[in-house]
Amino acid sequence: VYMEPQAEFETTKQAIRIKQLFADFEADYCVLDTRNAGVAIYDALAKVLYDVDRNVEYEPWTCMNDDKLKARIVIAGQKEVVFSVKASLELNSKIAVSMRDSLNNRMIELMVSNQEGVEELQRLYPEYVSADVDTQLFYERPFLETVALINEMIGLEYTVQNQTNLIKIEERPGARTDRYTSVSYGNYFVSLLEADLFSDSSGYEYVTLCN
């Protein structure tokens, strides 16, 4: 699991960064929270985007599981890669169970600790040692984000609702769940994809998603 914080609030820039990562990791799907401000990011992803930094034009995307969302923007050549998530109490419970099962069954591989990551960086990139602090932090950021994810998950509280038996996850006061939410949404989509592909007797290949 690779993660990075998104500090940019302008939707078009966020969409371009998503498509950069999608291209970098040769991903096949993008799992997107389309509630509230997320729908604006979807609208940007659904259009042709030009990346000035990389001098690349990105093809438009469209939604694969929500016809209403798909109909918001229709452009020729759209690629059906966006899996929309609009969480409800019931869906959140399914996502929590799926995430728990994946962790228990060691089906998710996180990046190594920051200390191990720094050791690997020193071994693989000699220039890292003499680089300035900002450059070193750039290389270390994914490992630091992994540590933050683990801390988020440790701080979560699981409760089972008496009447519905649904699982509700709550963060402790002052805590965040952004990283957990992102990873758990992606994991839930993978579980659906896996179930669908396993039902196909023709077999399948592993794919990469961008969340």
Q: Where does each model-flagged region fall?
A:
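Mg2+-dependent endonuclease catalytic cores in nucleic-acid-processing enzymes, primarily RNase H-like
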Residues: 1-160
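Amphipathic alpha-helical interaction segments
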Residues: 69, 133-137, 166, 188, ...
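Acidic two-metal-ion nuclease catalytic site recognized across multiple nuclease folds
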Residues: 159, 176-211
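Short, solvent-exposed helix-loop connector elements
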Residues: 162-173
